[in-house]
Amino acid sequence: MSAPAIAIIDYDMGNLHSVSKALEVVGARPLISDRPAEIFAADAVVLPGVGAFDPAMARLQERELVPVIEQIIEQGMPFLGICLGLQVLFECSEEGTEPGLGIFAGKVKRFQSEPGLTIPHMGWNQLTLRPSASPLWQHLPPSPWVYFVHSYFVAPEDPSLVAATVCHGQQTVTAAIARNNLFACQFHPEKSGAVGLQLLRNFVALVKD
């Protein structure tokens, strides 16, 4: 099969080119776009994002991308959310007042202050994987190190959504979710070295299947 076309949704929230480059490295044909026709024509969709919740939702609304994302997920097209692209899938955030996409029940919460704890949670940290939770964990070490930059985390109402957790200080929070063909992670695969590339390789393999 030829390289699968993966649409990277462009809504002016963060550098999309590092995600695009990483997908290229693992054998995909990435396309950065905010045009619904191009996004729907792809084999899979990635929603990255860095920044704050309210501006992200405002940009998605302005570009009329909310119904596009909803339809893609409803149709079961392979979907990967990264960082802010995970958070906007939930109902709301303590960071702002805008409603999220509400694909899943739950909210985005801020890390609690602890003595000596740095917020944002920034740098490399180890995941605790739920092995059966996601085909994206194939060929990864048991407790892989990945790269985080965030002050907020998702708290799903349905615990079965959680595919991986991470500890920051005394707090264990959701690091990734998985449901059918939808996956989303709080960490940055494109900044997570060999582990991140393997995760993206697994996503591309899933698209090829």
UniProtKB/Swiss-Prot annotation:
Keywords: Amino-acid biosynthesis, Cytoplasm, Glutamine amidotransferase, Histidine biosynthesis, Hydrolase, Lyase. GO terms for biological process: L-histidine biosynthetic process. It comes from the Bacteria. Residues 5-209 form the Glutamine amidotransferase type-1 domain. GO terms for cellular component: cytoplasm. Its EC number is 4.3.2.10, 3.5.1.2. SUPFAM superfamilies: Class I glutamine amidotransferase-like. It is found in: Cytoplasm. Gene3D superfamilies: 3.40.50.880. Pfam families: GATase (PF00117). The active site is at 83 (nucleophile), 188, 190. Pathway: Amino-acid biosynthesis; L-histidine biosynthesis; L-histidine from 5-phospho-alpha-D-ribose 1-diphosphate: step 5/9. It catalyses: 5-[(5-phospho-1-deoxy-D-ribulos-1-ylimino)methylamino]-1-(5-phospho-beta-D-ribosyl)imidazole-4-carboxamide + L-glutamine = D-erythro-1-(imidazol-4-yl)glycerol 3-phosphate + 5-amino-1-(5-phospho-beta-D-ribosyl)imidazole-4-carboxamide + L-glutamate + H(+); L-glutamine + H2O = L-glutamate + NH4(+). One of its GO terms (molecular function) is imidazoleglycerol-phosphate synthase activity. Heterodimer of HisH and HisF. IGPS catalyzes the conversion of PRFAR and glutamine to IGP, AICAR and glutamate. The HisH subunit catalyzes the hydrolysis of glutamine to glutamate and ammonia as part of the synthesis of IGP and AICAR. The resulting ammonia molecule is channeled to the active site of HisF. This is Imidazole glycerol phosphate synthase subunit HisH.
